[in-house]
From Swiss-Prot:
Lineage of producing organism: Bacteria, Bacillati, Bacillota, Bacilli, Bacillales
Cofactor(s) named in the record: Mg(2+)
Gene name per UniProt: hprK
Name of the protein in its database record: HPr kinase/phosphorylase
Pfam families, A to Z: Hpr_kinase_C, Hpr_kinase_N
Job description of the protein: Catalyzes the ATP- as well as the pyrophosphate-dependent phosphorylation of a specific serine residue in HPr, a phosphocarrier protein of the phosphoenolpyruvate-dependent sugar phosphotransferase system (PTS). HprK/P also catalyzes the pyrophosphate-producing, inorganic phosphate-dependent dephosphorylation (phosphorolysis) of seryl-phosphorylated HPr (P-Ser-HPr).
Organism of provenance: Staphylococcus carnosus (strain TM300)
Keywords assigned: ATP-binding, Carbohydrate metabolism, Kinase, Magnesium, Metal-binding, Multifunctional enzyme, Nucleotide-binding, Serine/threonine-protein kinase, Transferase
Length: 313
C-alpha cells in the first residue's frame, strides 16, 4: 500500500503538520492543483488526489478577504486527502497549518518547482499504482526489444534464453515475470527479487547469469514489445510461412505482437528470435517485408493475367 510517508522519503519532503495522516493510502495517480477550489468552487473537488499548491494558488489565496481564508483552506483537508504539498519552499499559510493539524491531513513542503514536482510525482505514482500481473515465461532484451518467451513447461524457454545471453543479449527474468501496466500500451516486466539474475537449466540446475557472464548480461526491468510462443511442431497444423497473419497476446489491458514458433530438432530457436526482434523493429519503422512480398506477388499475378489475355486475343 502506497502512503504519503513513502513520498516524504522518496522526494525529500518536509513535514509541517498532520503527521498522524502520513499512513493514509494513495489510490489515485492524478494530482490536483486546486485553483478553482481556492476561488470557492468545491462542487467537483477531487479530494482523493494529492493537492499541490504553488505560487499561483497561494498568491490568489493571499488576495482573499480575511474572513474567507480559514474556511477555504479547511475545505481542502478531507479525510481521504492523501497529502497537501506546498512547493518552491514557500511557507504554508498559518490557516492551512492549523487546518491540517486539526483534521490530520499531512501538510508537506518541497523546494522543487511546482511543474517539475508534479511531473516526477505523476511518473512515480503511475509506476507504483499500476495494475500488475505475473506470467510464466522468460523475458530477454534482444536488440533493444523486450521479448517475452512463453510456452509449455519443458519446451526449452530457459535454454533458449541462455543461448541468447551467450550471443550478447540480456536476461531480465526467468520462469516468473512480474508485469506492470504503467500506461495504456506500456508493459514493464521485471523478475521477483527471489530469482533475480537466476536461470534454471534442467539437468544443470540454477545458475547466476550475472556472475557467469557479467553485469552487462542482465537488466532489472524492460518494456515488453514482442511475445514469442514456443510449441512442439505439429505436422497437422498450418504455420504462418509469409508473415501476414498477425497474432496478439493480451496482458491486462494491453495487446502485444505475438509470434508462434514451432520447435523441433535442428531449428536454432535463438537465431529465429533474434531475427523476429529485428523484424519487429523494422515493422515499427514502417517496413513490412511480408506486405512488400505480397504486393510484388499480386503485381506479378496481375501482369501474367494481362499477358495471357493479350495472347488469347
Amino acid at each position: 500500500m502506497l502512503t504519503a510517508r513513502a513520498l516524504v522519503n522518496k522526494f525529500n519532503l518536509q513535514l509541517v503538520a498532520g503527521e498522524e495522516g502520513l499512513d493514509r493510502p494513495i489510490h489515485n495517480t492524478d494530482i490536483s492543483r486546486p485553483g478553482l477550489e481556492m476561488a470557492g468552487y468545491f462542487s467537483h473537488y477531487a479530494s482523493d488526489r494529492i493537492q499541490l499548491l504553488g505560487t499561483t494558488e497561494l498568491s490568489f489565496y493571499n488576495l482573499l478577504p480575511d474572513e474567507e481564508r480559514h474556511g477555504r483552506l479547511r475545505k481542502l483537508c478531507r479525510p481521504d486527502t492523501p497529502a497537501i504539498i506546498v512547493t518552491r519552499d514557500i511557507e504554508p499559510p498559518e490557516e492551512l497549518v492549523v487546518a491540517a493539524k486539526e483534521l490530520g491531513t499531512p501538510l508537506l513542503t518541497s523546494k522543487d518547482a511546482t511543474t517539475s514536482l508534479m511531473s516526477r510525482l505523476t511518473t512515480y505514482l503511475e509506476h507504483e499504482l499500476a495494475k500488475t500481473t505475473s506470467l510464466h515465461g522468460v523475458l530477454v532484451d534482444v536488440y533493444g526489444v523486450g521479448v517475452l518467451i512463453t510456452g509449455d513447461s519443458g519446451i526449452g524457454k530457459s535454454e533458449t534464453a541462455l543461448e541468447l545471453v551467450k550471443r550478447g543479449h540480456r536476461l531480465v527474468a526467468d520462469d516468473n515475470v512480474e508485469i506492470r501496466e504503467i500506461t495504456k500500451d506500456e508493459l514493464i516486466g521485471k523478475p521477483p527479487k527471489l530469482i533475480e539474475h537466476l536461470l534454471e537449466i534442467r539437468g544443470l540446475g540454477i545458475i547466476n547469469v550475472m556472475t557467469l557472464f557479467g553485469a552487462g548480461s542482465i537488466l532489472t526491468e524492460k518494456k515488453i514489445g514482442l511475445n514469442i510462443n514456443l510449441e512442439n511442431w505439429d505436422k497437422n497444423k498450418l504455420y504462418d510461412r509469409v508473415g501476414l497473419n498477425e497474432e496478439t497476446l493480451r496482458i491486462l489491458d494491453t495487446e502485444i505482437t505475438k509470434k508462434t514458433i514451432p520447435v523441433r530438432p535442428g531449428r536454432n530457436v535463438a537465431v529465429i528470435i533474434e531475427v523476429a526482434a529485428m523484424n519487429y523493429r523494422l515493422n515499427i519503422m514502417g517496413i513490412n517485408t511480408a506486405e512488400e512480398f505480397n504486393e510484388r506477388l499480386n503485381a506479378e499475378i496481375l501482369r501474367k493475367n494481362e499477358h495471357k489475355e493479350e495472347n488469347e486475343s
